[in-house]
Amino acid sequence: RRNIERIETATYRKEEIRFAVISDTQRWYDETEDAVEALNRRDDLDFVLHTGDMSDFGLKLEFEKQRDILSGLKVPFVCLLGNHDCLATGLDVFRKIFGTEDFAFTAGNVRFLCLNTNALEFDYSSAVPNIQFIREEGDHVPEGVEKTVVAMHAGPFSEQCNNNIAEYFQYYLREMPDLQFCVYGHGHNVSVDEFFDDGIKYYECSCAKDRSYLFFTLNSNGYTYEVVNF
């Protein structure tokens, strides 16, 4: 989680935060390298968020190769757990290389909640999504945080999610300070949905094969969203 420290230090008291989202880079190593090159050409980027599925089969070699490619980024990056990342011993490897599957950090005045939503891979035997983690985040908001962005691999109502508690999940997300929007991957598509008809948009990022990433800017005027092809 050294990258989280880098993000928090570099964005401390910044009034405008700009970040990119990539997802589902499994198998597509050349395209992932091209994504890194495209992102490195920007001079307006604070960090990169990878919403999971770095591996296809949960193999250590896959994670290491993805880590090595992503380490070529000029800016810090963080990675979420995808459903494919859970296969075989993938969860253990993910934790060793990238850290815990539920985590949060602050960039400027924005709290980023990064959540494991791959309930199917855990046979519904674990707290996925971890509502207690979300509640604790809501109860202990760091000083200076004014708004929130939530990231996950699988979006609500996908086959991966525990959809019995979808409304409950959204309720606690909305308890966070001024929830702006959510980002996710998994479906290998670009889409924008308002799953709960509550004004909160969910932005889906496509896979590396489709050679695009999402770019967000957050400031006092709200936020902007862009799909960038490379």
Go through the PLM ranges and name each one.
Residues 24, 52-53, 82-83, 153, ...:
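Active-site glycine-centered loops adjacent to acidic/histidine catalytic or metal-binding residues
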Residues 1-65:
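N-terminal active-site segment of His-dependent metallophosphoesterases
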Residues 61-78, 138-144:
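Aromatic-lined substrate-binding rim segments of carbohydrate-active enzymes
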Residues 32-37, 52-71, 86-99, 160-165, ...:
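Metal-dependent catalytic neighborhoods of phosphoester/phosphodiester hydrolases
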Residues 16-26, 109-119, 149-153, 201-207, ...:
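Active-site-proximal beta-strand elements of phosphoester/diester hydrolases
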Residues 40-47, 122-199, 224:
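His/acidic metal-ligating clusters that form di-metal
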Residues 1, 6, 22, 105, ...:
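Binuclear metal-dependent phosphoesterase catalytic core
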